[in-house]
Amino acid sequence: MKIVTIVGARPQFIKLAPVSKEIRRHFEEIIIHTGQHYDFEMDKIFFDELEIPTPNYNLNIGSGSHGFQTGEMLKKIEEILLKEKPDLVLVYGDTNSTIAGALAGSKLNIKIAHVEAGLRSFDRKMPEEINRVLTDHISNILFTPTETADINLKNEGINSGIFNVGDVMYDSLLNALKLIEKKNFKILDELNISKKKYILATVHRAENTDIKENLENIINAFIESNEKIIFPVHPRTRKYLEKYRLFEKIKNYDNLKLISPVGYLEMIYLENNAKKILTDSGGVQKEAYFLKVPCVTLRNNTEWVETVLDGWNILVGSNKEKILENISKFNPASETYNYRFGEGNSSVKIVEVLRNL
């Protein structure tokens, strides 16, 4: 069987790594990198760290409106599918690359498999939610991470092709922890910060960066907390920090340590050694949960509802008072932890399903 895998954003590379490794033991795989966020050279550290094969095709789409990105991807992916004639198109998550790949394949009557199917935030204002729903409804094989995802699909009338395989990001995280043992990261020494004596923060979503009031609230909460906060700054976040003149303000406060974005392994290292995590990233919420690190989510909803139900993740949006309150007071009890994301063998289960098609 020939499988075309479509990715374009860094969280997808993390999901791709264990699955691709398993796929290549049994099938032919062609990887398309859409370049939705960055070109391959910018993303090369992820491919190298995670030992992902070099993509067969790099589309270099770059940034742009949702319509522009999706349309350009759709055209170029269709050309490749017509040339490669795969038996299956495999897509991950909820990006524009996901929906473009699924649409291109389905219109050519190629089977679509969706990894991370069934997730719902129930907020149709989120572009990711639209991508998730549409992709699920045109996919033939739906690989879900949780029972909640299964229920979501069935509530929407999807009753066949659902396979609960657990979460592939847990596969990646377990592998990352093994690789980190062989590394000697110096970042905490360079920042003069001890393990479990800092909070790790990430901010990148449009609702938090593009709206000045929201970004100001978040940054002011970070400053006023007086906690040591390590803050890897996403390029779009940096752009808006500079635009709103918050970048200069931050430099006056020693508790807030701004650093450049880091690779996957170093990010897991920072997450694992943080006493708490502040984020608006879906992937980081989940990694925090896997690592049993309390997470304060700078959003009003989440697709990872299990992390909230277990009491290890709390949603605060961009409300400064709520952020400050939970920086100081949010400390989940270990007995509430009820892990339900699979056993770290999701990639094996996915390939077992594909082998039995």
Curated annotation (Swiss-Prot):
* A Pfam cross-reference name: Epimerase_2
What family is this? Belongs to the UDP-N-acetylglucosamine 2-epimerase family.
User: What's the superkingdom here?
Assistant: Archaea
According to its UniProt entry, this protein's organism is Methanococcus maripaludis (strain DSM 14266 / JCM 13030 / NBRC 101832 / S2 / LL)
User: What is the protein name for this chain?
Assistant: UDP-N-acetylglucosamine 2-epimerase homolog
Question: Per its UniProt record, what InterPro entries does this chain match?
Answer: UDP_GlcNAc_Epimerase_2_dom, WecB-like
| Keywords tagged on the record | Isomerase
The EC number of this protein is 5.1.-.-
Picking any one GO molecular function of the record gives: isomerase activity
